């Protein structure tokens, strides 16, 4: 009796652990490629995302099936976010010393990052629903989706803008900072955390612990301020 290769392949691709396997495998391969080449366009998040999408298309798997199979990884997002408090704690003294510069930077840069994206979209004639979806692009996906829904945007579209913003920020952010001669770890971390949220924070942690600590702080505070102030600003202005 000849082996049923098609049945075996179907059983493999529909196994509950298949999604986890390709996700972790794609990310590890992307990390190895980035560490070996240090080429900015081999950003692990971007490469692994494109790899997983390609595998899903080749295997004929729907996003719903993939999402169900990686539910365990989704549950780990919470602990992973909490783990960002470790570099914060290790650099707590340094953060206290720079408390007021941090707050001032957050207010100015956060406002600029929010207004710039929506402003450019408005200049190009984007509809209001598109503007409201793009406005919270510089915070993490859960907060951005919630805020977008509150101010009249599309939550799923906001998540797409968040991912694009994070990947682009992680790719070009460090180069722009070096070009502008910004070498201080705290300044680099704040810039990456404010503009590129979690992806930028991961990139900042590759630079140094201090850079990662300030990126995590900026990402957290940016999320809180955006969730509170952006809906209020939209109500007052519109």
Which residues are covered by each model-predicted region?
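Helical membrane-embedded segments and adjacent short helical loop/helix-boundary regions
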Residues: 7-23, 27-89, 94-101, 105, ...
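Internal active-site segments that recognize and position negatively charged phosphoryl groups
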Residues: 91-167
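Proline-rich low-complexity regions
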Residues: 44, 87, 135-136, 231
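Residue-level detector of alpha-helical segments with a strong bias toward transmembrane helices
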Residues: 53, 70, 101, 150, ...
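Juxtamembrane helix-boundary/capping and inter-helix hinge elements in multi-pass membrane proteins
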Residues: 38-39, 61, 89-100, 124-129, ...
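Gly/Ser-rich, low-complexity
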Residues: 1-2
